[in-house]
């Protein structure tokens, strides 16, 4: 019996793995196992209240740890890491994604075969192996008529839970827009790449397990659900405001507010603490966002 072939060392040396943690201490042990042998790893901690930083220092001593003074959001934290990357590629990796050196090397080697590509993602699966929907096509360009990807695809959007970046192609376009605290930052990034005629590839032969919503853990899960609803609603509105204008964002807010009120009422009548917290967070997020003030701030800054 022959020993398994080790992942190409050259491929691993060409990439820096970037991880953003926020109360993600429970994920660090699995990350450390999967990334053993990866020479370049940067972890950015978004002011966690748990022992995420201590576990990174203990279990991933070779990783560079950047501690943010406050939670600046997913995009801003990744930007802090991207600014430090000196390799050809960067790999964004959510703490709740289980990967290893073979998968990382396969992503890098596949990307090298497509020198025009800016971004590339694997096929994500859940813990049972079921495929997750982590990419889509621009609806105004064409409508897909097939099922799951069976070969390399060039798409309009790909989820940044696991995303390989060719640095020389993304730098001129800019990294994540810190306007988006959480959610829609990858939609915005992909749209800018797509508008610049960049390639966003899906590499379905590489599969990575994504334990969706597993990055953050605490003793108040309803609070995490409230935050998800709050930031998802705000980021959705901000995306529309940025790319379609304030009038479109106002119309969207009216529609989503109406549906959010109905959703809250439904969750009160059919109690589910987590779903009620998420629905209430969505409602509050929409109410709290001042589009007019935001427009004035951006006009003054720009």
Regions found by a protein language model. Give the residues of each.
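Short, well-formed alpha-helical segments that are part of the catalytic scaffolds
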Residues: 19-37
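Acidic helix N-cap motif at the loop->helix transition within catalytic regions
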Residues: 26-30, 50-58
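A conserved acidic beta->alpha catalytic loop
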Residues: 45-54, 70
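Acidic/His-rich active-site region of diverse nucleotide-sugar glycosyltransferases
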Residues: 70, 76-84, 97-181, 187
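Short aromatic/hydrophobic "clamp" motif used to bind/position activated sugar donors
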Residues: 90
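Catalytic donor-sugar/metal-binding loop of nucleotide-sugar-dependent glycosyltransferases
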Residues: 171, 175-181, 187-209
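Nucleotide-sugar-dependent glycosyltransferase catalytic core
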Residues: 209-234, 274
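Non-catalytic, C-terminal membrane-associated alpha-helical segments of glycosyltransferases
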Residues: 227-234, 246-302
């Amino acid at each position: 019996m022959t020993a398994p072939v080790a992942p190409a060392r050259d491929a691993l040396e060409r990439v820096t793995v970037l991880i953003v943690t926020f109360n993600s201490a429970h994920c660090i042990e699995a990350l450390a196992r999967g990334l053993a042998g990866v020479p370049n790893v940067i972890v950015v901690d978004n002011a966690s209240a748990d022992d995420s930083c201590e576990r990174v220092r203990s279990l991933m001593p070779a990783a560079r740890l950047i501690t943010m003074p406050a939670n600046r959001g997913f995009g801003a934290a990744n930007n802090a890491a991207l600014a430090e990357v000196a390799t050809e590629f960067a790999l964004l990796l959510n703490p709740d994604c289980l990967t290893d050196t073979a998968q990382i090397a396969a992503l890098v080697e596949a990307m090298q075969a497509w020198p025009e590509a800016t971004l590339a993602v694997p096929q994500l699966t859940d813990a049972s192996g079921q495929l997750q929907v982590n990419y889509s096509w621009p609806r105004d360009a064409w409508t897909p008529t097939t099922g799951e990807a069976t070969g390399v695809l060039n798409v309009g959007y790909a989820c940044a839970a696991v995303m390989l970046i060719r640095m020389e192609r993304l730098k001129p376009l800019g990294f994540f827009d810190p306007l988006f605290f959480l959610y829609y930052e990858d939609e915005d990034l992909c749209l800018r790449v797509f508008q610049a005629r960049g390639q966003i590839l899906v590499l379905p032969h590489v599969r990575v397990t994504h334990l969706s919503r597993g990055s953050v853990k605490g003793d108040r899960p309803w609070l995490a659900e409230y935050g998800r609803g709050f930031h998802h609603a705000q980021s959705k509105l901000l995306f529309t405001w940025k790319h379609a204008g304030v009038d479109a964002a106002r119309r969207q807010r009216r529609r989503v507010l109406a549906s959010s009120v109905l959703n809250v009422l439904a969750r009160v009548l059919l109690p589910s603490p987590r779903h009620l917290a998420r629905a209430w967070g969505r409602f509050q997020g929409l109410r709290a966002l001042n589009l007019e003030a935001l427009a004035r701030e951006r006009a003054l800054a720009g």
